[in-house]
């Protein structure tokens, strides 16, 4: 199997294609991407027969910025007979994947696919039963086995394949289902909540998003991101010339500092989190984030980089490379991840975690 399907935000197919082509080449997997504008997915086709399998096995899904999901597929199944769509799909998957732990019948995230989504939901139950009977799926769901994907691009037309549960998105269609909290000051709060789900393993939340931590929110007004920190019982310094929502101030956990986020300097050295969602050129934001990390002003940060109209992948790559270079220069080991989240628009969200410092005299930041 030499093809890989990648879901993405509609309108960002070119960025997703540029990224997979670049990162596949680094693994010495060469091929080309098939792109249909505003389709919400990209198909990368390698020149060698096992290229798709190699990518989903060896390319860390966490390293991809513009992809919501990644799985290997075979040839497109066309014109499935309405009276029996199941048999061809089962036949396509037999011998390809054995004892998958989960089935996802999916569509791309577009308005055109909403009607098809209703069919997918109804179709999942009988297809799952048939795949279990054929030995393609285990008799019970398990996260320890591959995920079987059936991806419909049109009625009666689908790709079939699989992903590895330790190298994919755990979410259906690659989208976490989050509910907007009615007491949040703005919908931007969902960006930070989604970032926590994507970047921080669930079993580490109690340690890394703990009660009583100190946090800073740069460009905080009206408080969508501060809300998420307060919700986790952190003490938050919210930095912005604009006012904060009174509901947040009433908690007693928020200190509002009327300052420019680019000029603010923290006066304490035990800040666990700094978050930032400012509308500014990405290079300027990247430089500020690097400054915070190099100076040890925070242990972890989540921030947004607003994207230009053109060469978005190149711009983000340059910004991330700049931050990495600054950390390397100062002997700081850190983990960097970036993703265009479901709740992001013309932007990507970046997470950086300082692990330890290799410079004498600088304390361990873990």
Swiss-Prot record:
InterPro entries: RlmM_FDX (IPR040739), RlmM_THUMP-like (IPR048646), RNA_MeTrfase_FtsJ_dom (IPR002877), rRNA_MeTrfase_M (IPR011224), SAM-dependent_MTases_sf (IPR029063)
Gene Ontology process terms (BP): methylation; rRNA processing
Catalytic reactions of this protein: cytidine(2498) in 23S rRNA + S-adenosyl-L-methionine = 2'-O-methylcytidine(2498) in 23S rRNA + S-adenosyl-L-homocysteine + H(+)
Molecular-function GO terms, alphabetical: S-adenosylmethionine-dependent methyltransferase activity
Active site (record annotation): 306 (proton acceptor)
Gene: rlmM
Function: Catalyzes the 2'-O-methylation at nucleotide C2498 in 23S rRNA.
Listed GO CC annotations: cytoplasm
Compartments where found: Cytoplasm
Keywords: Cytoplasm, Methyltransferase, rRNA processing, S-adenosyl-L-methionine, Transferase
Assembly and interaction partners: Monomer.
Protein name: Ribosomal RNA large subunit methyltransferase M
Enzyme class of the recorded protein, top EC level: transferase
Main subcellular location: cytoplasm
Pfam families to which the protein is assigned, alphabetical: FtsJ, RlmM_FDX, RLMM_N
Top-level taxon in the UniProt lineage: Bacteria
EC number: 2.1.1.186
Protein residues bound to S-adenosyl-L-methionine: 188, 221-224, 240, 260, 277
Protein family: Belongs to the class I-like SAM-binding methyltransferase superfamily. RNA methyltransferase RlmE family. RlmM subfamily.
């Amino acid at each position: 199997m030499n093809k890989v399907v990648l879901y993405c935000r509609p309108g960002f197919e070119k960025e997703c294609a540029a990224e997979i082509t670049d990162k596949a080449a680094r693994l010495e997997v060469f091929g080309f991407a098939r792109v249909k504008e505003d389709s919400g997915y990209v198909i990368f086709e390698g020149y060698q027969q096992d290229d798709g399998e190699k990518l989903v096995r060896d390319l860390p899904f966490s390293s991809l910025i513009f992809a919501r999901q990644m799985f290997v597929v075979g040839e497109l199944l066309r014109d499935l007979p309405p009276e029996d769509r199941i048999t061809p799909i089962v036949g396509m998957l037999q011998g390809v994947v054995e004892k998958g732990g989960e089935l996802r019948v999916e569509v791309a995230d577009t308005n055109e696919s909403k009607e098809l989504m209703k069919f997918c939901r109804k179709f999942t139950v009988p297809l799952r039963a048939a795949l279990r009977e054929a030995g393609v799926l285990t008799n019970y769901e398990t996260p320890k086995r591959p995920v079987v994907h059936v991806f419909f691009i049109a009625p009666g037309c689908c790709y079939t394949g699989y992903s590895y549960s330790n190298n994919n998105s755990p979410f259906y269609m690659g989208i976490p289902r989050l509910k907007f909290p009615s007491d949040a000051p703005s919908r931007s709060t969902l960006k930070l909540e989604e970032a926590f789900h994507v970047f921080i393993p669930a079993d580490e939340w109690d340690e890394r998003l703990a009660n009583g931590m100190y946090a800073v929110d740069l460009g905080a007004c009206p408080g969508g991101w501060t809300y998420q920190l307060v919700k986790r019982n952190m003490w938050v310094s919210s930095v912005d010339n604009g006012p904060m929502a009174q509901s947040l101030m009433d908690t007693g956990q928020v200190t509002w500092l009327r300052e420019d986020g680019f000029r603010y300097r923290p006066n304490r050295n035990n800040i666990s989190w700094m978050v930032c969602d400012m509308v500014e050129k990405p290079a300027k934001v990247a430089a500020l984030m690097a400054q915070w990390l190099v100076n040890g002003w925070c242990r972890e940060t989540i921030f947004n980089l607003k994207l230009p109209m053109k060469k978005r992948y190149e711009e983000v790559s340059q910004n991330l490379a700049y931050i990495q270079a600054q950390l390397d220069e100062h002997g700081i080991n850190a983990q960097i991840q970036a993703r265009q989240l479901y709740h992001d628009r013309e932007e990507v969200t970046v997470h950086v975690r300082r692990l330890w410092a290799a410079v004498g005299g600088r304390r361990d930041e873990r």
